[in-house]
């Protein structure tokens, strides 16, 4: 399980150090793709296979299902950690997530998310005040 928030930087070549706490679970290779809210999602290869199986059940007769699958899968790339624990984030994904030099990497249960730091801070500030309301509105879930 992934959890926590870490600040890292992109270098001039588009490489970013993956938080050491995430490296073990991700293994040497994992998948990153376009996420929601203009961030990137990162999945273990095993979790990626689970997602692929779920996506296969989406009805191809539904336009939105086709659009979502195209965006999600066309942006996916398998990345490999180098000896310094870095991954190379392709230009198209850096542009999608507006990644600049300063990044925030967060753990969200079964995935990691890579955010531009300013975007994450804005999202967090906007969401912080409504955190309890969101929890109440979602489902009856008890901690």
Swiss-Prot record:
What range(s) does the SpoVT-AbrB domain occupy?
A: 5-47, 76-119
Which interval of the chain is the signal sequence?
A: none
- Per the record, GO CC terms? cytoplasm; nucleoid
Q: Which GO terms describe its biological process?
A: negative regulation of DNA-templated transcription initiation
Task: Locate the transmembrane regions by residue number.
Answer: none
* Coiled-coil boundaries: none
Give the matching Pfam families: MraZ
Q: Which UniProt keywords apply?
A: Cytoplasm, DNA-binding, Repeat, Transcription, Transcription regulation
Its localization reads: Cytoplasm, Nucleoid
Would you say which domain of life the source belongs to? Answer: Bacteria
Any keyword Glycoprotein? no
Keyword match Repeat: yes
A GO molecular-function descriptor: transcription cis-regulatory region binding
Q: Describe its partners and assembly state.
A: Forms oligomers.
Q: Give the family this protein belongs to, as stated in its UniProt record.
A: Belongs to the MraZ family.
Record-linked NCBIfam families: division/cell wall cluster transcriptional repressor MraZ
Q: What is this protein called?
A: Transcriptional regulator MraZ
């Amino acid at each position: 399980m992934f959890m926590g928030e870490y600040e890292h930087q992109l270098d001039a070549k588009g490489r970013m150090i993956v938080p050491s706490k995430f490296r073990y679970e991700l293994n040497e290779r994992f998948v990153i793709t376009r996420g929601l809210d203009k961030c990137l999602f990162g999945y273990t290869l095993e979790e990626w296979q689970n997602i692929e199986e779920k996506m296969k059940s989406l009805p191809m007769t539904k336009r939105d299902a086709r659009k979502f699958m195209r965006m999600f899968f066309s942006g996916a790339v398998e990345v490999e950690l180098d000896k310094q624990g870095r991954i190379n984030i392709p230009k198209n994904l850096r542009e999608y997530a507006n990644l600049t030099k300063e990044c925030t990497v967060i753990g969200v249960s079964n995935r990691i998310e890579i955010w531009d730091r300013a975007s994450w801070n804005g999202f967090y500030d906007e969401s912080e005040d409504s955190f309890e309301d969101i929890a109440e509105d979602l489902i009856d879930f008890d901690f």
